[in-house]
Structures are given as structure tokens and as C-alpha cells.
Regions:
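Alpha-helical transmembrane segments of multi-pass membrane proteins predominantly involved
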Residues: 1-170
Length: 170
């Protein structure tokens, strides 16, 4: 599941996969694939691998993976000049945020209602991520069709030239 959700150290292929394909295909990879992976991972960890009492054996490792994933995703995005790679690293960082929440459930410190709220928060985050990740990929797809650049610098002037398209990047 680490590769499917984009968790470090399994995330290394994600920036190459997003930047090496069309923006619409990358948008599907960034949304549908990640959503299905997270739902399956949460189902496995919280239904099958969760003990009746006390912490789960996997929560410590998942907590460390989530911290590394958050940090790596954000730092790597800073050095990229390809918008699809920036979005890929953003997906990696968001995977870390959601993994941190899942590891909080596994710690055993959250009681029943708190665990349920964490699950709802992760699912909400996942839904928002899916909705707001498609916008930038659609904009990049439109720019590609018009023969635009594959660099962040190619987005200069987008807000003055097409404000609606620029707003869709957020």
C-alpha cells in the first residue's frame, strides 16, 4: 500500500509517473489511485489489524513513515520546476498527513468517538484532495493542448490572461 498511497520510501516513482504522462492521466493517477489506496489501507489497518485494546503493532512504524513522507514531499516540491512534479510531491505530502491521522488511531490513545472523528477527517481530507487535485491537472492539460510550457515559469501571466483558469489552479 505504500506505493499506492505515495508514502516514503515507496513514493519515488510518483513524480516520474505524473510528469511522464499527459496531465489528464496524471490527474487520474493523483486522485482515483490514491483514494482507492487509502480506503483499502484504512480498511485493512483499522478493521483487520487493530487490536481490541491498546496500541496496534503497526502504529509506530506508520508514524515514522508519515513524518518522513510529509517532510520529503514538501521539501522536494520546493526544488522542482515542473508543475506536474510539484503536484506529485504535494500528493506525497498529503499522504503523510493522512497517514499521521491513521497512526494516531493505531496508537490506542483515541477512544471510540475520537477514532471515528479521525476516520471522518481522513476521508474528508481525501475527498477534498481528490476534488482540488483535478483542477490543476485540467489547467495543465489545457495549457498542454495550447502548446504551453511544461515549466512553472510557463504559468507566468496566467492570472492576467485567463483569471478563471488561474483560479482553477487552487
Amino acid at each position: 500500500f505504500g506505493f499506492k498511497v505515495g508514502a516514503a520510501p515507496f513514493h519515488l516513482a510518483i513524480p516520474d509517473a505524473y510528469s511522464g504522462t499527459s496531465s489528464m492521466v496524471a490527474g487520474v493517477l493523483a486522485t482515483a489511485s490514491k483514494a482507492m489506496g487509502f480506503v483499502a489501507l484504512m480498511r485493512l489497518l483499522l478493521t483487520i489489524a487493530m487490536p481490541a485494546t491498546g496500541p496496534a503493532f503497526w502504529y509506530g512504524a506508520l508514524a515514522v513513515i508519515s513524518v518522513v513522507t510529509m517532510t520529503w514531499g514538501n521539501l522536494a516540491a520546493l526544488s522542482s520546476d515542473n508543475p506536474k512534479r510539484v503536484l506529485a510531491y504535494s500528493s506525497v505530502a498529503h499522504a503523510g498527513y493522512m497517514l499521521a491521522a491513521v497512526s494516531a488511531i493505531g496508537s490506542g490513545l483515541a477512544d471510540g468517538p475520537a477514532s471515528e472523528m479521525i476516520v471522518v477527517a481522513v476521508l474528508f481530507h481525501l475527498c477534498v484532495l481528490v476534488l482540488f487535485k483535478m483542477g490543476p491537472f485540467m489547467v495543465l492539460s489545457a495549457i498542454e493542448r495550447e502548446g504551453g510550457s511544461h515549466r512553472v515559469a510557463g504559468l507566468n501571466g496566467l492570472a492576467s490572461g485567463d483569471p478563471l483558469m488561474a483560479a482553477s489552479m487552487f
